[in-house]
Regions:
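Structural detector for short beta-strands of small beta-barrel domains
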Residues: 2-23
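Short, contiguous, well-structured surface segments enriched in hydrophobic/aromatic residues
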Residues: 26-49
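Short, structured beta-strand/loop micro-motifs enriched in basic residues and often containing a Trp
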Residues: 49-59
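Short nucleic-acid-contacting surface segments enriched for D/E, G, S/T with interspersed K/R
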Residues: 60-75
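A generic structural signal for short beta-strands and their flanking turns/coil linkers
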Residues: 25, 53, 71-73
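Short glycine-rich, polar/acidic loop-and-turn segments at beta strand-coil junctions
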Residues: 33, 61, 77-81
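OB-fold/S1-family single-stranded nucleic acid-binding modules
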Residues: 80-111
């Protein structure tokens, strides 16, 4: 049975997967570091020995396709899982982001 956790407003960042095996898209969202996690999420991740900042996010696919990598999204989401599966964050595909911050990728070398 899926986790029964509350929804929270959390920051996520888009990134490119190193391996797309088993995934529909190469771009995904993960929890942005350096934010305070609700105790409910922190405790569940600790119990399952999971790094909350490495979990993927199920949400509106527009965030993968219509924004550049490294864009940050403030979403209403919750921690959940599927029976026998790994945990992930869920935000309904019908919901809009509360805030979006586009990041410009800088070149590796500057003159």
């Amino acid at each position: 049975m899926a986790l029964k956790q509350s929804y929270y407003d959390l920051w996520f960042v888009s990134f490119r997967l190193l391996s797309t095996s088993g995934h529909r898209d190469a771009i995904h969202l993960k929890l942005k570091r350096n934010q305070n996690l609700p105790p409910e999420i922190a405790e569940e991740c600790k119990v399952r020995s999971q790094d909350p900042f490495s979990l993927l996010t199920e949400c509106n696919r527009d965030y993968f396709t219509n924004y550049p990598v490294s864009t940050e999204f403030l979403l209403t989401a919750r921690l959940t899982d599927r029976e026998g599966g790994t945990m992930f964050f869920y935000s309904s595909y019908r919901w809009q982001a509360i805030d979006v911050v586009k990041r410009i990728a800088l070149p590796l070398f500057q003159r």
